[in-house]
Amino acid sequence: MRIDVLSIFPEYLEPLKLSLIGKAVTDGLLQLQVTDPREFATDRHRTVDDTPYGGGAGMVMKPEPWARALESVLRAGSDTTARSGSTAATSASAQQATRLGPDDDAAQPGDAGQGTAAPDYARTGGTPGAGRAASSRPVLVVPSPAGEVFTQEVAYELAEEEHLVFACGRYEGIDERFIEWARDEVRVRPLSLGDYVLNGGEVAVLAMVEAVTRLVPGVIGNPESLDEESHTGGLLEYPVYTKPAQWRERTVPDTLLSGHHGRIARWRRDQQLERTARRRPDMVLALDPATLDRADLAVLAAEGFTLRDGQWQRCSPAPSEQAPEGARDMA
């Protein structure tokens, strides 16, 4: 997978060099490049913003530097893909070497309109996205409080892509014409972390990139851990414990110490259902009843959720007024 981030504050993305993502880049599982649109500005002051038409507070990001920056990373990405495909066809042993890695070509400041164009650029007069099937085009993610909510499901969808580009807007946002133009070159996906506003897109991109890349095969050492996390299967994760068994007058639930795998699995499932019902009742209402067994339904009923004509009904009193979370132990 190749990931490009467009930001006028590239230092903000330094944490992506750390931990598992940094290791994945070193190992060649990911290619990660940060590009500053300021390097594509045309004036000596490298201006990337201006006042909004129609008046109002704040500044708006100018479209041309962003368009040039995007064109640059699309050329670099397409060139990498073309070379990878050619190398893979040469020999089976070369396939491993063609995985995207830190030594592949990447967008460099000021290279808009330069470099070796990929074949489809040459056929279409230098337009990065033209002549390419829509489903094969890179995805441009634009963090925005006006976008669709970024969820674990969206993370899984993005993890299937070969090339992601993130545009970190600032101030009042990027000129809408850039977004409209980009739709002819890439698949544009405005995404929001939630119902709140940040100073810029960098914080959101850090979260999104981590959520997406950890789903790429090989990035997480134990892929089975992904199956037990919150939001997998529509439920929150169960509580976890480690040694010592007793700490400051608090003990690990007896079931987890029993060694009985069936009881442990049931306890964890019950905890997932309880926690989801109390913290995220909206997720319970979205559960498919066909995926639940009798024991599941009993736990949810105790938390105030019952089925009527195949539809979830929430009873009173609210689950938060019931027994403390985690009080039930099956030992």
From Swiss-Prot:
Annotated region (Disordered), positions in chain: 77-137, 312-331
Species the sequence originates in: Kocuria rhizophila (strain ATCC 9341 / DSM 348 / NBRC 103217 / DC2201)
Listed Gene3D superfamilies: 3.40.1280.10, tRNA(m1g37)methyltransferase, domain 2 (1.10.1270.20)
Protein name per Swiss-Prot or TrEMBL: tRNA (guanine-N(1)-)-methyltransferase
Broad EC category: transferase
Chain intervals with Low complexity compositional bias: 77-99, 107-134
Domain of life: Bacteria
This protein's encoding gene: trmD
Keyword tRNA processing applies: yes
Signal peptide (residue range): none
